[in-house]
């Protein structure tokens, strides 16, 4: 009898999860992805400082090599952004 109750609760939880998560799955964080097919590079300038160039604003340059490899080519990825309608939301996160 207990097994039947546990099974019913589990099935209900899965169905509820499916109903509430389908809207999230259809949302795209890409929008108009300005970072698609953009490449970036890492080099050292004349002063010996690391220079990363090639990605537009709002994009992150990701390299598939170690941090000490120069020069290196990477790929640009768009950073995810979030917004809130609650004025106190930022203050709560900073605490």
Curated annotation (Swiss-Prot):
Source organism per UniProt: Rhipicephalus appendiculatus (Brown ear tick)
GO terms for MF: toxin activity
* Example of a GO cellular component annotation carried by this entry: extracellular region
Function summary: Complement inhibitor. Prevents complement-mediated C5 activation by binding to C5. Binds C5 at a different binding site than the other tick complement inhibitors OmCI and CirpT1, and the drug eculizumab.
Where does this protein reside within or beyond the cell?
Secreted
UniProt entry tagged with the keyword Secreted: yes
Task: Reply yes or no: does the keyword Protein biosynthesis apply.
Answer: no
Which UniProt keywords are given for this protein, alphabetically ordered? Complement system impairing toxin, Disulfide bond, Secreted, Signal, Toxin
Q: What is this protein called?
A: Complement inhibitor RaCI5
Give expression by tissue.
Answer: Expressed in salivary glands.
Q: Which family does it belong to?
A: Belongs to the RaCI family.
Tell me where the signal peptide lies.
1-21
The primary site where this protein sits is: secreted
The disulfide bridges present are 35-59, 40-61, 55-76
């Amino acid at each position: 009898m207990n097994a039947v109750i546990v099974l019913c609760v589990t099935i209900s939880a899965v169905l509820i999860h499916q109903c509430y998560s389908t809207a999230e799955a259809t949302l795209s964080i890409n929008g108009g992805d300005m970072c698609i097919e953009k490449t970036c590079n890492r080099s050292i300038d004349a002063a010996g400082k690391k220079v990363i160039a090639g990605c537009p604003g709002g994009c992150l340059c990701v390299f598939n090599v170690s941090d000490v490899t120069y020069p290196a080519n990477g790929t640009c990825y768009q950073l995810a952004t979030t917004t809130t309608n609650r004025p106190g939301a930022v203050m709560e996160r900073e605490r």
